[in-house]
């Protein structure tokens, strides 16, 4: 799988994911002034938000999908 791992919105830096990490994800803070703190990368499954929902989490299973 190839996923973007840039933490900067609108910047794409594709990376080859390690074996077993077949999900691309993006975690973006819900509070708009912190959107630049997003995190993108590879995972073995879609990450979950904690008890207090502070992130919008998107996941997909195709190359460069987020």
Swiss-Prot record:
This is Clarkitoxin-I-Mdum. Disulfide bonds join 3-24, 17-42, 46-59, 60-65. It is found in: Secreted. Expressed by the venom gland. Gene3D superfamilies: CD59 (2.10.60.10). GO terms for cellular component: extracellular region. No toxicity is observed upon intravenous or intracerebroventricular injection into mice. Has no cytotoxic activity towards C2C12 cells at 100 ug/ml. GO terms for molecular function: toxin activity. InterPro entries: Snake_3FTx, Snake_toxin-like_sf, Toxin_cobra-type. Pfam families: Toxin_cobra-type (PF21947). It comes from Micrurus dumerilii. Keywords: Disulfide bond, Secreted. Belongs to the three-finger toxin family. Short-chain subfamily.
């Amino acid at each position: 799988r190839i996923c973007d791992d840039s933490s900067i919105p609108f910047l794409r830096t594709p990376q080859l994911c390690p074996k077993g990490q077949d999900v691309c994800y993006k975690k973006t803070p819900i509070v708009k002034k912190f959107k630049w703190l997003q995190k993108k990368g590879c995972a073995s499954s879609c990450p979950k938000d904690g008890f207090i929902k502070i992130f919008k989490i998107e996941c997909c299973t195709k190359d460069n999908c987020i």
